[in-house]
Amino acid sequence: SVLQWISIKKRHMDLSKYIRDIPDFPIEGIIFKDITPLLSNTHAFQETINRIIDNYNFDEIDVVASVESRGFLLAAPIADRMKKPLVLFRKSGKLPYKTKSASYDLEYGSGTIEIHEDAIKANDRILLIDDLIATGGTLGACLDLVDQFKAKVNGIAVIIELSFLNGRDLLKNVDIFSIIKYD
């Protein structure tokens, strides 16, 4: 049918053409990978969500979690489609209830990430969503927080992986799915 053909054709969509490079942002020497063109194209955005969802067994995930802020844009529709609760990792001082925290280093600085102390239960199996893996610092801090709950990250999914920054090295023993890799 025509709908099946459209679905198959979209599966071969080159999503990298919807990523825009912004030189010297947020600081000089960094080339920022802007996902807003992908988000503003309904077909590209839907294809991104579908590729992530198609990579996971819903029965092996209890919670979809995400990292502030671009990860939220992906995780909300993924959690909805998987019929799983959504948990948010936020920058320090952004959550109103009692929190647990972990510090991390970025490609261009450092920071602290927090999560509500009741957001995850022991033995929860988590799918962690973000827009990008660079050095792995932010996602590594999320893994540290998940460990504090005695839960487990069953997978990490991102749109973009900057593999030349070796972020996977910090995220050992976790299955990582990235749609676009820059070497």
Predicted regions and their residues:
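Short, glycine/charge-rich flexible loops or terminal/linker lids adjacent to PRPP-binding catalytic cores
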Residues: P85-I126
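Active-site-facing substrate-recognition patch
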Residues: H12-I61, G111
